Amino acid sequence: MSNGTGGRGQRPVFTDQEALLFHSQGRPGKLEVIATKPMATQRDLSLAYSPGVAVPVLAIAEDESKAFDYTTKGNFVAVITNGTAILGLGNLGALAAKPVMEGKAVLFKRFADIDSIDLEVNSEDPDEIINCVKLLGKSWGGINLEDIKAPECFIIEQRLRELLDIPVFHDDQHGTAIIAAAGLLNALDLTERDVKTTRLVCNGAGAAGIACLELLKAVGFAPENLILCDTKGVIYQGRTDGDRKSVV
């Protein structure tokens, strides 16, 4: 299998073997941890670890907000998945999702200089995932949920937003929705159409599709002009097959 056809505005061309080589050459994977402070002398080591580290420990114990001053917390995001909806590949398990999560982490670093770590949670139980992230949540400044299938992704995101005091962002919902809404608003502007009277069909009722329509309603699309379809057809109030909620 190869990817794309090349040329300007088209996806780069590469073979499966080239993709595997990219991920395996040198140090395997796409992430590493580097020190942000010098580690050249015994004094440096004493400040970074024992006994010097006790000073910020005590400061944070007295006031947890100091973690933003003395640790990586404020610029540290956790990219979290259970691998149940990996790209267009489906449910392939938590570990198989690791290359994607590493990829998202390097995008954070490359384009926003935000540090992050990937966490693959080996569970399909929403309550287990919620509890896992809740217990670890104080470590980071934000949560990026990714490649978790619907409808569990909605449950997980909503509960974590209620439980944690840091931003929780589900990439497949909100990232896709923001880009789609921006593109549509620009298209309407170029074609001189009114957002309130434009009719739109969304083909796909997963996390991304539902989030797209929710945001489009928020920016002015009339609910009666939005049609959402899944593999069984148009979604409507009273439909009994499938497990997708109606949002229109």
PLM region spans:
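N-terminal ligand-binding/catalytic initiation module
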Residues: 2-167
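Glycine-rich phosphate/diphosphate-binding loop of Rossmann-like nucleotide-binding domains
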Residues: 87, 92-112, 164, 170, ...
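Acidic, His- and aromatic-enriched active-site or binding-groove loops in soluble protein domains
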Residues: 173
